[in-house]
């Protein structure tokens, strides 16, 4: 026994003579935000109703061709303002899918802020006038690369498959099947790659002639192609106004039986500046909560169109708050998110596909089949994105060669994917196994010597 004790001591000495590698300590972070799901006619974090109390965010506008979530200096500067305002969601219209977004998404998470993300950009999008040509494998590769990049973050709330592709021109409705096919493809990609089932939907223009048809179209047909939510951009409440004067009461009435969550993807009329944002009072009350899950104010920075609550000065290092910044901050404080379910129905239901008329030219619920070259992405992934400097996808790559069968986009995990968006586990300390192994070796030798 004395021999064993001496051998054990020697083994411990050998192990302690090899110091354990010192790992760089990661900065302490807030716990991950709970993921948001779409169920019934509302959004939820666990069993709690979630309301979007947010703002649209794209410094430089669409012509700026920049990604605010890849620029750490810019996003940190603006996230401080978001936190001060009290928003819980931002919408970003364009990102560079060749860049990392880890730092800015973590900063947003630490601030308690979710992201609603458009998957398109001016170079990679559905062309409303040439939808068949623009729905191609090159386009979908960019879309899937964006989805893959942002599905790993717990605070990615939702994806938009399109924004105002359908407008007041009747022939623009012919693009609807291609946007809906993109919705189907994103949902299938998430499932096939084993990624989190992030809600996917469409942001519509508020066009009275086809608003109802558009909403029904994205909620009809087989489940694999139906949207998870519907959103539209609304500027009809122009102060001084009211719930009834603005017509918002009718927009509640008209969607009372709609079977999906709805929110306003843009709101905030600028007819009589400065805006007071008093309509938030209705949006956060039982005037609307049974049907609507909040909305996103348009927009954060002034971009020459009359909107914006801050001015970005010079090299964008300074931010000047306007009166509207203070007004929005006051409104968000004055009208908190409701508690409870808000009267939302817990079950979802599909709509009947709209029939053809002068304002709606889609005559079938059939969708284009995914282009053959894009099918491989479902199992092998999209790979690196082309970014904002890519060649673009208009009239590029293979297009759809036929009509898809209903249910063809049903998902089944065919890849292990990345189902969790949490931080990696810390490196395992192997010293225990080293001690155990060496002790075992000396024990064996000691036994043989006895």
What residue spans do the PLM features occupy?
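N-terminal carbohydrate-binding accessory modules
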Residues: 2-8, 12-84
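Fungal extracellular Ser/Thr-rich, low-complexity intrinsically disordered regions
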Residues: 16-46, 300, 304-307, 311, ...
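Hydrophobic faces of well-ordered beta-strands that scaffold small-molecule active sites
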Residues: 53-55, 90-92, 115-119, 157-161, ...
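Short, acidic/polar
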Residues: 64-82, 139-147, 210-223, 276-283
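Aromatic-lined substrate-binding rim segments of carbohydrate-active enzymes
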Residues: 74-126, 179-199
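Active-site groove signature of glycoside hydrolases
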Residues: 143-174, 201
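Noncatalytic carbohydrate-binding groove/subsite architecture in carbohydrate-active enzymes
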Residues: 171-283
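Cleavable C-terminal sorting propeptides in eukaryotic secreted/cell-surface proteins
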Residues: 419-450
């Amino acid at each position: 026994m004395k021999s064993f004790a001496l051998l054990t001591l020697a083994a411990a000495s050998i192990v302690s003579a090899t110091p354990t590698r010192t790992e760089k300590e990661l900065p302490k972070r807030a716990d991950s935000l709970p993921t948001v799901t779409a169920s019934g006619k509302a959004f939820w974090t666990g069993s709690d109703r979630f309301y979007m109390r947010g703002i649209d965010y794209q410094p430089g506008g669409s012509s700026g061709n920049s990604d605010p979530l890849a620029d750490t200096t810019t996003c940190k500067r603006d996230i401080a303002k978001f936190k001060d305002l009290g928003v819980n969601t931002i919408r970003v219209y364009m990102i560079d899918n060749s860049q990392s977004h880890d730092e800015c998404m973590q900063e947003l998470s630490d601030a308690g802020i979710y992201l609603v993300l458009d998957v398109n950009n001016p170079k990679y999008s559905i062309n409303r006038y040439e939808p068949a040509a623009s729905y191609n494998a090159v386009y979908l590769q960019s879309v899937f690369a964006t989805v893959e990049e942002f599905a790993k973050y717990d605070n990615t709330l939702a994806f938009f498959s399109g924004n105002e592709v359908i407008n007041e021109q009747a022939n623009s409705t012919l693009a609807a099947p291609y946007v809906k096919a993109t919705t189907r493809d994103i949902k299938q990609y998430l499932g096939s790659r084993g990624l989190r089932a992030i809600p996917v939907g469409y942001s519509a223009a508020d066009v009275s002639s086809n608003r109802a048809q558009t909403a029904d179209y994205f909620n009809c047909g087989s489940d694999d192609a139906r949207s998870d939510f519907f959103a539209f951009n609304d500027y009809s409440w122009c102060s001084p106004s009211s719930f009834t004067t603005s017509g918002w009461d009718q927009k509640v009435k008209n969607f009372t039986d709609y079977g999906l969550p709805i929110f306003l993807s843009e709101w905030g009329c600028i007819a009589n500046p400065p805006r007071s944002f008093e309509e938030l009072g209705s949006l956060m009350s039982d005037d609307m909560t049974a049907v609507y899950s909040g909305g996103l104010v348009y927009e954060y920075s002034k971009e020459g169109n009359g909107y914006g609550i801050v001015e970005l000065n010079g090299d964008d290092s300074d931010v000047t708050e306007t009166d509207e910044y203070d007004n929005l901050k006051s409104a968000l404080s004055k009208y908190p998110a409701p508690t409870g379910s808000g009267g939302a129905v817990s079950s979802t239901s599909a709509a009947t596909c709209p029939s053809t008329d002068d304002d709606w030219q889609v005559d079938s619920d059939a969708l284009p089949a995914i282009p053959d070259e894009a099918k491989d992405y479902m199992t092998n992934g999209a790979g690196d994105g082309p970014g904002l400097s890519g060649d673009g996808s208009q009239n590029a790559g293979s297009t759809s060669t036929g009509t898809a069968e209903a249910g063809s986009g049903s998902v089944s995990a065919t890849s292990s994917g990345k189902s969790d968006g949490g931080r990696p586990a810390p490196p395992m300390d192997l010293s225990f196994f080293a001690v155990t192994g060496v002790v075992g070796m000396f024990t064996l030798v000691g036994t043989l010597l006895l």
